Amino acid sequence: FRPGSGIEPPQLLREVRPIYTDDARRRAIEGDVVMEIVVRRDGTVGDVRVLRTLGSGLEQRAIAAVRQWKFAPARRLGSAVDVVVEVAVGFTLR
């Protein structure tokens, strides 16, 4: 399923931030890695597909972080369901 038309979207409960690669830090790369993820009915992250990357290994770091995220699951007619959502993982140098 996808959120909308009777599907309550999942709610992010725990977000893990990604760690920069040395190469990306050296090159001062900032921006978002955009992914399509499956949020399972148990609130864990299933399949991940990268839609837009930044290079320098940041997509792997973003995937590793997102796989640790925890959600309150999406619901359809009161029951938890698997749902596909798009997320952006931001990389900002500080």
Residue locations for each model-derived region?
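Acidic, low-complexity proline/glycine/alanine-rich linker and hinge segments
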Residues: 1-27, 64-66, 87
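Alpha-helical interaction segments
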Residues: 10, 58-62, 81
